[in-house]
Design a protein with these regions (language model features):
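Residue-level recognition of specific faces of alpha-helices
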Residues: 6, 31-34, 55, 72
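Residue-level detection of the helix-turn-helix DNA-binding "recognition helix"
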Residues: 12, 26, 37
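Short, charged recognition helix plus adjacent turn
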Residues: 54, 58-85
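Short alpha-helical DNA-recognition segment
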Residues: 17-34
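DNA major-groove recognition helix of helix-turn-helix/homeodomain DNA-binding modules
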Residues: 25, 39, 46-63
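Short basic helix-loop element that most often maps to the first helix and adjoining turn
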Residues: 7-20, 82-83
Length: 85
């Protein structure tokens, strides 16, 4: 389950506006704004929620499930490339 707070936090980590998320997910900006205005689980149509989540995950954000410590987001650790000599 992804919450609207996680979506907002993910946008903040990425430095994205609602317009940026809309463009990258293929969802209209008014839809992003409407979905973010409702507290709780990300609602709307299932396909819309999947597009939003996929855009954010594709940009390197991991969603952290509620596990007693609270749900959240974090940036994926980038793999280090070793230089070859």
């Amino acid at each position: 389950m992804v919450t609207t707070r996680q979506i907002k936090a993910a946008r903040a980590l990425l430095g994205w506006s609602q317009a940026d998320l809309a463009k990258r997910s293929g969802v209209s900006e008014p839809t992003v704004a409407r979905l973010e205005s409702i507290e709780g689980e990300l609602g709307g149509r299932e396909l819309t929620a999947e597009k939003i989540r996929a855009a954010i995950e594709g940009a390197g954000v991991l969603f952290i499930d509620e596990n007693g410590g609270g749900s959240g987001v974090r940036l994926r650790k980038r793999s280090k490339q070793r230089s070859r000599k």
